[in-house]
Amino acid sequence: MASSLLLALLFLTLATVVNLKTDGPCPACWGATFDLESHRELLLDLAKKSILDKLHLSQRPILSRPVSREALKTALRRLRGTRAETLLEHDQRQEYEIISFADTGLSNINQTRLEFHFSDRTTGGVEVLQTRFMFFMQLPPNTTQTMNIRVLVLRPYDTNLTLTSQYMLQVDASGWYQLLLGPEAQAACSQGHLTLELVPESQLAHSSLILDGVSHRPFVAAQVRVEGKHRVRRRGINCQGLSRMCCRQEFFVDFREIGWHDWIIQPEGYAMNFCTGQCPLHVAGMPGISASFHTAVLNLLKANTDAGTARRGSCCVPTSRRPLSLLYYDRDSNIVKTDIPDMVVEACGCS
């Protein structure tokens, strides 16, 4: 309900701004007279609404289980060292990497049970591609240990966990270890919960076999993919001076300014940008506008233009966008890395 009211208020305010200036044929053609600073709050609200919509969130996450900065830095450093490849801009599918830190479950001297919680991301064609378990072990010098790692799942209509697969890992030194988990673990992650049980083959006289301290907290990294659309990058013309021609107006959204720096880890902000300016008839008809919240606003403004205007001119609209790479906490305090499509306006043209 609050989201709908915000959207309605935003549309109404933008429409009011444009209707005060009806000297142009297109409501998007604000030209050089558009006062950026006076509408700053309005644009920031638009940016927040767009990000939440693309992340399928009704409101910003409230962190229930904060993760220490030391654990966060360690996890990101380990992942960057083991996964060098990056998402390509021409990849047609949106990818996420979700990092879930372990909560200690039912454990004793013979075993350690770790619980990992994932938000429900299985809707909308999301596929879990890979699941990796990363943990730190500390052993006395000149010691070898064999660790049995079990994947436990809760079957439908069952109250007990079921063993679905297990892995044997030999450890001969203290340090970080990673294990690539199979389809059973991937299925568990897609259902929102994964349980791992670590059982040493022999008992060692050591108080901290598996460290779950501040900087050695075990975690699972799940790589998932969702189908998307192919985008082609084009260069745009930035607005300069007093030019009234169609151009790209740069606008930076600072996440600290809007109070989102506590749940968005990286980046510190992004260049939202928008299109403004006039479109002469001889440059009209450029294709390439893609459906987005930005486009919906412009379409509504166009519909609210003075009904008495007989001639509808060409509009200055986005013709190319690129994704926003975002690293953030979800509502379960998991770390999510994703590229949100169509967030940064790269080029503008005349519709």
From Swiss-Prot:
Q: Which Pfam families match?
A: TGF_beta
UniProt cross-references to InterPro entries, sorted A to Z: Cystine-knot_cytokine (IPR029034), Inhibin_betaC (IPR001318), TGF-b_C (IPR001839), TGF-beta-rel (IPR015615), TGFb_CS (IPR017948)
Q: Is the keyword Iron assigned to this protein?
A: no
Tell me the domain of life: Eukaryota
* Cellular component terms per the entry's GO annotation: extracellular space
Disulfide-linked positions:
C239-C247, C246-C316, C275-C348, C279-C350
**What positions does the record give for glycosylation?**
N110, N142, N160
Localisation per UniProt entry:
Secreted
User: CDD domains attached here?
Assistant: TGF_beta_INHBC_E (cd19406)
- Keywords per UniProt: Disulfide bond, Glycoprotein, Growth factor, Hormone, Secreted, Signal
Could you cite one Gene Ontology molecular function of this protein? cytokine activity
**Propeptide cleavage-removed residue intervals:** 19-236
Does the keyword section mention Glycoprotein? yes
The secretion signal range is 1-18
Gene3D superfamilies recorded for this chain? 2.60.120.970, Cystine-knot cytokines (2.10.90.10)
Q: Function, please?
A: Inhibins and activins inhibit and activate, respectively, the secretion of follitropin by the pituitary gland. Inhibins/activins are involved in regulating a number of diverse functions such as hypothalamic and pituitary hormone secretion, gonadal hormone secretion, germ cell development and maturation, erythroid differentiation, insulin secretion, nerve cell survival, embryonic axial development or bone growth, depending on their subunit composition. Inhibins appear to oppose the functions of activins.
The entry's family comment says: Belongs to the TGF-beta family.
Kindly state the subunit structure of this protein: Homodimeric or heterodimeric through association with alpha and beta subunits, linked by one or more disulfide bonds. Inhibins are heterodimers of one alpha and one beta subunit. Activins are homo- or heterodimers of beta subunits only.
**Protein name per its UniProtKB record:** Inhibin beta C chain
Q: Which organism is it from?
A: Rattus norvegicus
Give the lineage.
Eukaryota, Metazoa, Chordata, Craniata, Vertebrata
Gene symbol of the encoding locus = Inhbc
